[in-house]
Each structure stands twice: as structure tokens, then as C-alpha cells.
Amino acid sequence: MGIKHLYQVISENAPDAVKTGEIKNHFGRKVAIDASMSIYSFLIAVRSDGQQLMSEAGETTSHLMGMFYRTLRIVDNGIKPLYVFDGAPPKMKGGELAKRSARKREAHEAHEEAKETGTAEDMEKFSRRTVRVTREHNEECKKLLKLMGVPYIDAPTEAEAQCAVLARAGKVYAAASEDMDTLCFEAPILLRHLTFSEQRKEPILEIHLDKALEGLGMDMAQFIDLCILLGCDYLEPIPKVGPNTALKLIREHGSLEKVVEAIENDPKKKYVIPDDWPYQEARELFFNPDVRKADDPQCDFKWESPDVEGLVKFLVTDKGFSEDRVRNGAARLAKNLKTAQQSRLEGFFKPVAKTDAEKASMKRKHDEKIEEQKKRKKEDAKAKKEAKARPRGAV
């Protein structure tokens, strides 16, 4: 799930933190990818007639199809991917996982009912909600990656946290995930949409943590408190506290301790803290997640030549893929993983640090831009209100 509305908050209040671009812009870079999130998206997206792809033996192959062809696309564009798999979830995540499981059961029942009475759209919608990544899906994807010569590592708990460690250490350029909580684990750069299909034509989003903090006017501790208040995987959100309110509360009070105190002492009782809301524990999970250090031997990785015959046996003989396509893909892998060794020019130049005056000027321009946006919103709201109040037919 990640952090609710965090991308909206950053894009509206720290627009300089977000860059959009094409996948080819990341040529020559190493990227750590949240494998479990990617596999989930493959199971949802790689479908035929609303159903997951199956082998002749009735085994699901959507995850393998997605992993093979999306990884090929990444490598074709000169990127060297490293996949990171989730380990056991933190205990605090148990409540959220239980809720997801309950929602999936409800969706499964609704899907069965839609088969009898609903439309094709209803069936597709509820079918997608029943999807979950199993241990077997993970193991098959690991086998595939090994045959492709693409490295992977197993995280002790959260894959996003491990990706962030590798990015902070400079072992990869960025962490790639659709989960915005990757930023809470202090990933310097987060890439979104990297494993999307080419047909979706979604630009790659590149989110820079330092610019997000600068634009929001927060330090890392306040940013994590904001994310907890927005709603994370570890705690249920405070009812009626949306993104604008969460941002206002953190800016006004500076920390969750003071926010909670203000809410509890409010005579109007506008907001109510849930009975069991251990935000200090959630904060600790973001600050000190269970991860392997970047110099851990298990975090050593390298890209190798694909095992062509092994791929043919696994994907063609066992899973029913097209042999021509698999062999063609293996040839592209072998060629492009070598090409990706080329260095980017930026690696030879050290960026020049901005002066205090330049930073102040950038902040002033940013503040003026935000004020202008607020002014436009007020004017639009006023115009809509006047239009509604105007008698029908009046000019």
C-alpha cells in the first residue's frame, strides 16, 4: 500500500523533487527493484480475457511472462536491474496484512457472484482484487532471474528498506518501487513506473528525497511523522485527517508527539486518535528497519551471461512459452547487459554545490509558485460558486 497521498503532497508542495522522463534516460545505471511489488503488478496486468495467463498444465505464468519481458525492456534500455525480494513482514504489519486478506476474501466472493450476475467489467474488477503473490511465485521468479543472469537478493523484511540501503551506499543509482514508503527508508532517489509495460506509455517518475524535504521545509524525522499521519502499512490512519490536514498539523506542531497532544487536548474533539495507535513503534521501523548492511556478503551481486538452454527448458518445455521469443530474448540479454557496462558521462563530473544565496532564491521562487497556485485555486472555486448561484439562463 505504501503512504497514502504522499506523491500528491510532494508534487504539490515540492514540485522540484519530481522529474519525469523516458526509460532510456537511465542508460548505464544500476537500479534496485522491489521484486514483490513488481510481481504483484505483473499478476494484475499480464492477463488474457480477464484471467491470468496459464500453462497447459494449468499453472499461472503471468508473473514469469511479466518478469521476463519487463526485465528485457529494462536491459534493452541500458539499465542493470537488481531485484530485491521481501522477507518476513514486521509484526506491526500483521494488522494491515489481515485487512488485505479479508478484502481479498470479500473480492473473491464478489467475483464468484459477478460470474453469475455481473458484467465483464465487474468480473475483471473483482478478479484483480483477489490477486496475491505466493511463495511459489517468488521462487519461480528467482529461478527465472538466475537463468537470465540477473542478480537478486533476499531482504530480511521489507524489500523497499533494503533497496534504500543499497541506494544510500551508492551500490545502485536508485530504488525502484511503486510504494512511496521507500522514501521513508531514506532512499535518496525513488523511481516509479520502471517495470510498467511500454504500452502504458507512462513516464518514469524520479523523486529526489533531499528536494522533497527542502520543498516541504522538513527534516527526515518530521517527514516520517508526516507519512505516518498520512497513513502507512503499520497503522490505521486517524479518521478525517487527509493530506492537507496532515501537512498542516506537522508544520504547525513539528512532531507527532505534539500533534497527538493537541488532538487529545482539543475541546472540540475534531479528530479522534484510534485506541491502539503506537506511532513511536511505526516510526522506529522506518528509522531502524531490519536490513542487511550494504557491505554484507549477501549484498554482493553481479550480472552474468544468460543460461540459454536453461531458459528454454524452464520457459518453453515447462511453461509453454514460444521458443523463438525466448531465444531471441536471451540473445538481447547477452548483448545488452554488456552494453550497459558503458559509463555515464555524469560519473566523471562532480556536481557543483549551490550557494546559500542560490538556495534562498530557489526557495523564494518555489514559495511564490505555491502562493500563485493557491490564488488560482481560490479564484477557480469562487468562479464555480458564482456560476452555481447564477440563475439558469442568465449571462
Curated annotation (Swiss-Prot):
Modifications made to the protein after synthesis: Phosphorylated. Phosphorylation upon DNA damage induces relocalization to the nuclear plasma.
Subunit structure: Interacts with PCNA. Three molecules of fen1 bind to one PCNA trimer with each molecule binding to one PCNA monomer. PCNA stimulates the nuclease activity without altering cleavage specificity.
Biased composition (Basic and acidic residues): 356-389
Gene3D superfamilies from the UniProt entry: 5' to 3' exonuclease, C-terminal subdomain, 5'-nuclease
Lineage: Eukaryota, Fungi, Dikarya, Ascomycota, Pezizomycotina
Binding site for Mg(2+) 2: D179, D181, D233
Subcellular location, record wording: Nucleus, Nucleolus; Nucleus, Nucleoplasm; Mitochondrion
Enzyme Commission number(s): 3.1.-.-
Chain intervals for the UniProt region annotation (Interaction with PCNA): 341-349
A single cellular component GO annotation: nucleolus
Organism: Talaromyces marneffei (strain ATCC 18224 / CBS 334.59 / QM 7333) (Penicillium marneffei)
The protein, known as: Flap endonuclease 1
Entry's cofactor comment: Binds 2 magnesium ions per subunit. They probably participate in the reaction catalyzed by the enzyme. May bind an additional third magnesium ion after substrate binding.
Name of the gene encoding the protein in the UniProt record: fen1
Segments for region (I-domain): 122-253
Function statement: Structure-specific nuclease with 5'-flap endonuclease and 5'-3' exonuclease activities involved in DNA replication and repair. During DNA replication, cleaves the 5'-overhanging flap structure that is generated by displacement synthesis when DNA polymerase encounters the 5'-end of a downstream Okazaki fragment. It enters the flap from the 5'-end and then tracks to cleave the flap base, leaving a nick for ligation. Also involved in the long patch base excision repair (LP-BER) pathway, by cleaving within the apurinic/apyrimidinic (AP) site-terminated flap.
Family, per entry: Belongs to the XPG/RAD2 endonuclease family. FEN1 subfamily.
Record carries keyword Glycosyltransferase: no
Primary location class: nucleus
Any GO BP annotation: DNA replication, removal of RNA primer
